């Protein structure tokens, strides 16, 4: 299976992105009660809580990263990921293969 990349967005509403570094482990958690987007996936960092969301708009996504809508059914309620690269336009992250619903060893 191909690697799944996504863009972490909205960090300016929480802690900013200056603390984010390549290789950092992050957690994804579905937020079905989100009043703006029923397929919202929040991004959390241990010890800090919510730091942003998986981008769901082509305007906030970097390159060929997947939207929250495309990832939503590929994961359970929670998933693991890592930061790949921090840019001025957003943070590129990679979903852990083991977090995929279809994952088998």
Model-derived regions: residue spans:
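Conserved active-site motif detector
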Residues: 1-105
């Amino acid at each position: 299976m191909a690697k799944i990349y996504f863009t972490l967005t909205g960090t300016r509403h929480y802690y900013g992105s200056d603390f984010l570094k390549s290789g950092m482990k992050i957690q994804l958690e579905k937020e079905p009660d989100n009043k703006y987007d029923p397929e919202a996936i929040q991004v959390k960092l241990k010890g800090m809580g919510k730091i942003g969301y998986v981008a769901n708009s082509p305007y906030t996504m970097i390159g060929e990263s997947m939207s929250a809508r495309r990832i939503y059914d590929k994961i359970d309620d929670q998933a693991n990921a890592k930061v790949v690269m921090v840019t001025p336009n957003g943070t590129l992250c990679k979903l852990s293969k083991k977090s995929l619903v279809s994952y088998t060893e």
